[in-house]
């Protein structure tokens, strides 16, 4: 089982050339990012080819959700992504509207021929373990991008009481967002800090189970994106009064990448 590490552009600074060059020099398989602005599409494509980076496209739905999903996914195909990660629908939608959305989403996925992992994200349809399980059982072909940090935050637990839901999610994950959360938030200040060793161990256990299951199913690789976020997003902890981030964003994601490379091979 090969682990493919992707660099999230979230929080990076500089031009696309600056960002993608840094990712390539750091040894990442590819990048994960939203679709580029239309006036930068050619530059973005050329840089991916020049630097030999794969691309995971991110799409974010808004009202009307079916239409915005379809438009973004079809546009994403122009960039030959290895995978599409979607922030899909909303948590407050009626269940019948969510079912209608995901039925349509599966048809679009089949049309474009690219795997789509619907992210387990706060404010979205898959914002809890139990709502996600319900959708996955309703649609056997539906896949997720596993970002369990959001579920820890929503449930205010380390998911001890949701073993059956977690088992379903683990078996349906096609991509991992490797960020460590805790019971009161989606991102610990630093995953290497000893005071968060319990949280790190829990997340590594979940990730290993995903990787092991994919290996048993005959997949040759699992893709993972270390995705600790910046201070201006509300994810990175900051010092009071100054607003200074408590750690360096590049360093914390590099720490996670190195840890994955050393520990995640089954």
Feature locations, PLM:
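Hydrophobic faces of well-ordered beta-strands that scaffold small-molecule active sites
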Residues: 1-8, 31-33, 53-60, 84-86, ...
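N-terminal pre-domain/capping segments
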Residues: 1-73, 77, 254, 258-266
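Histidine-acidic metal/acid-base catalytic patches
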Residues: 2, 13-22, 138-143, 152-266
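Active-site-proximal loop/turn and secondary-structure-junction residues that shape catalytic pockets
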Residues: 9-11, 35-37, 61-63, 88-92, ...
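Glycine-enriched alpha-helix->loop->beta-strand junction motifs that scaffold or abut catalytic
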Residues: 27-29, 50-53, 80-82, 138-144, ...
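Alpha-helix-loop-beta-strand connector modules within alpha/beta enzyme cores
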Residues: 42-63, 104-112, 138-139, 204-209
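Short, hinge-like loop/turn segments at secondary-structure boundaries
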Residues: 48-52, 73-76, 102-103, 134-136, ...
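Active-site acidic/histidine proton-transfer and metal-coordination neighborhood
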Residues: 61-143
